Amino acid sequence: TLGPIIHNPQVVSRLEGLGIRSADRVEDIPAGARAVIRSHGVSRATADALTRRGCEVIDATCPFVARIHAMAREASEAGRALIVVGEANHPEIQGILGWTNGEKYAVLTEEDVERLPHMAQATIVSQTTMVESKFRELCAMIEKKVAAPDIHATICPATRDRQKACTDIAAKADVMIVIGGRDSSNSRKLYQLAAAICPRTY
């Protein structure tokens, strides 16, 4: 797999015992090997590099992420800038940004938005694990920077439902425990949402 297939060290270790290894770079995957693209997706350049190595590619990119890749391509072809609301260093965001040849930006804070140049038009999308209220808040600021913004709330519906359930439970609970991988964006967002309501969140 190109990168850990899941944010769960125990599962990754078990898969390694079955001969399924994780590689951080395309160069670390043997030429002609079977290569799995995980749900985060990859950039066009990375996908092309796997093909050039003669790999048998199994594309497990999440359909919601693949849809954002298509939006990035469309923005590029139309000459529009692409703004992704999310964590710039997250593999999902890096993959999305790699599907446009035009201007591209990743923003996560108000300061990030303030640094954006003024532009005539842009396509705005979100990381699939983004908190919707935060996305809307930043989009309101982005609209002051972009004359003709094309906004798409590309948050995964399952993620949105989990976040709502988390805040509903946190409002009634004395203690909240979020069970998930420390490297998981989903787990971090659930923790942050719960902690803002229930101080005893772990």
Descriptions of predicted regions:
Residues T1-Y202:
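The feature marks the mature, well-folded catalytic cores of soluble enzymes
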